[in-house]
């Protein structure tokens, strides 16, 4: 994890370490996890099964991602740090560096190269252990937990702002670049499903229409024929 966070500004000095095991029919499945958040905008997660690197992840990665999202959202709601919609997995994992290692008595892989773990029982095992242990860590380290939640909230706001900017650009492209002649008096709403575009001929008609229109949902395009 320290290597993954090299040249990054970490949010918390302590690397969070989680261990657990679950007995299955053929023996015990052991889980080890180390994770730390930084100011980076991407995630970096490495997965291993019986010391073999799984570059394509697999069921241990799926379980980890689900647990992280659930645990951070649960803590944020409990401490009233989350006022709007639940944080997405992408928001929670932004800036995360993690290494998850599984010891399995009889693992299954997607191919002979063992690039991806496909043992289905591992998903639930990892999910349960990580959710419980990470929740305990958050309760015992509230300052670290708050930093992680705040990082995710910032990521969520940034993603929403970027989405609105993309929607606005697309919308203007449709209205302005779709072959409508003349000038456009845009409306306030950014929801295409409720917006209307009126074609108005002539300056005098355009002036009257501007005065009488609902600026929130009605846009005008002034044309000259």
Positions of PLM-derived features:
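GHKL-family ATPase ATP-binding module
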Residues: 1-222
């Amino acid at each position: 994890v320290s290597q993954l966070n090299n040249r990054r500004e970490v949010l918390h000095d302590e690397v969070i370490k989680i261990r657990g095991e679950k007995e299955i029919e053929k023996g015990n499945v052991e889980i080890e996890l180390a994770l730390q958040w930084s100011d980076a905008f991407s995630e970096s997660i490495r997965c291993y099964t019986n010391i073999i690197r799984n570059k394509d992840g697999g069921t241990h990665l799926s379980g980890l991602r689900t647990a992280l999202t659930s645990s951070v959202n649960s803590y944020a709601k409990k401490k009233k740090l989350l006022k709007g919609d639940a944080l997405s997995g992408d928001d929670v994992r932004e800036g995360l560096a993690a290494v998850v290692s599984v010891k399995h008595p009889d693992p299954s892989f997607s191919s002979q190269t063992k690039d991806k773990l496909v043992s289905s029982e591992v998903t639930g095992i990892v999910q349960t252990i990580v959710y419980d242990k990470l929740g305990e860590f958050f309760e015992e380290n509230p300052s670290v937990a708050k930093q992680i939640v705040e990082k995710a909230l910032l990521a969520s706001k940034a993603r929403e702002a970027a989405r609105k900017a993309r929607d606005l650009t697309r919308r203007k492209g449709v209205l302005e670049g779709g072959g409508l002649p003349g000038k456009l008096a845009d409306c306030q709403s950014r929801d295409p499903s409720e917006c209307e575009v009126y074609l108005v001929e002539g300056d005098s008609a355009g002036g009257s229409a501007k005065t009488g229109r609902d600026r929130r949902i009605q846009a005008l395009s002034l044309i000259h024929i």
